[in-house]
């Protein structure tokens, strides 16, 4: 068992980039046919993979900055300007700040000059996964707008999913909702 975050990386934690592919190749060469991992969902307070916001969404910390460069959404220079991540432990605060920064850059680049193939893939994914993705993206956008507070501490109409309040949130937070979908 090895969680991808335990793979070697210069970017704070291991991700689903080149080192994950190398690990899978190693498993295959050793005759292994399975890679057992801990849950891969987005984590909240405490950063435990067993305490996730979603059964379906992926943890954005597992997005490889190098693959975003390959897709033309970031530059090598942008990911080279990473913080000095500690060795031997994870500084989740530093990681979140940096990952959120580069994911925002990648999203802006995607929105302003979308690659046709990437755009088509995104739209296909968003349509295919809308049964969970729409609510998840709304939840994350509202959580961000609420200062990352626990949903139990949100204003009563939001907490109780008042239809009119949620519709207003969908309109007011449209850009952030799309960003959350993009990160998936």
How would you label these PLM feature ranges?
Residues 1-184:
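Acidic/aromatic-lined carbohydrate-recognition and catalytic surfaces
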